[in-house]
Swiss-Prot record:
This is Heptahelical transmembrane protein 5. Residues 1-79, 213-228, 278-288, 335-347 are cytoplasmic. It comes from Arabidopsis thaliana. Residues 101-191, 250-256, 310-313, 369-374 are extracellular. GO terms for biological process: response to hormone; response to sucrose. InterPro entries: AdipoR/HlyIII-related. The keyword Magnesium does not apply. It is found in: Membrane. The gene is HHP5. It is a multi-pass membrane protein. Belongs to the ADIPOR family. Keywords: Membrane, Stress response, Transmembrane, Transmembrane helix.
Amino acid sequence: MGDEAEIKEHLKPQASSETIDKKHNVKGKRLWQKVKYQLVEFHSLPAYLRDNEYIIGHYRSEWPIKQILLSIFTIHNETLNVWTHLIGFFLFLALTIYTATKVPSVVDLHSLQHRLPDLLRKTDLHKLHSELMSRLPSSPSSWHVMDLLYNCLPERFSHGNYTDMCVLHSVREDLANLIAPLIFRPITRWPFYAFLGGAIFCLLASSTCHLLSCHSERVSYIMLRLDYAGIAALIATSFYPPVYYSFMCDPFFCNLYLGFITILGIATVLVSLLPVFQSLEFRVVRASLFFGMGFSGLAPILHKLIIFWDQPEALHMTGYEILMGLLYGLGAVVYATRIPERWMPGKFDIAGHSHQLFHVLVVAGALTHYRAGL
């Protein structure tokens, strides 16, 4: 009996060394993956991921795409960088849809034509004539016209006299001459849509960059260049609406300023393609380049103020433009100086570090510019 049991035990199939090794490899691979997908500290990063030595921990390093995409819902030092601009992207997408459906795209000439007769009979024609001649050329959109007509002196007249009829005839001719060019060249809104498109592209590119850059060196290089292109696009297109609408009656300066800021934006994108542009030593250079792009818009703003210094609309818009510039400029300073994390390294790894503040200021500046464009 003992010999028989021993023979059965000997005949029982034994696990091969290859099978045992495979099990150990699978177990080891799972353990390695678990360790690999953990967040690491700055000193463990490859060189291409080292950007801010004041952010000590909570880095993702060379994760696979699937894990990176899932990390959008987890906590790490890029979480708020992704979401601040991703929320901004959806916000500007909604504003673009709202603008296309709610804000008039051209001068409502037909509405103006039907409403003018009644309005003319209810206003002081002398005041109307002088106001239209002095203010309409610089603000030809229909809501400006209607605002002017409604805000003329409230005197009413029930019986037209010869003087009123002469003024009415003069107003009719002058108004026709002023609005006639708009029939053949209606006021376009492409500059405003260009700005909205630039903002959408910038915010989406930024979110994508912060989410995917930790995958590999090649992906990081591509994503960062896309991010720089988005910043240049936002800055350049931000000047399209104020330049176009301020100088639409002066094609030379309109084309000059639009061409200059466009060429400057393209040049900035080309410079950003250089590998050295991403190095730590060029951090201040990067911020200065984008700051210089924004500062170049000071020329058309001052030019506009010289021409329309007595127009309330121009002063109102300039106020918003100055606020926008301050927000963008403050963002560039925070980005370059890496405040506040340089004061307390490691304390702002998850929330409150300079790049997150920079993102918030960019979105605030873009929203300010949107309000100015309305």
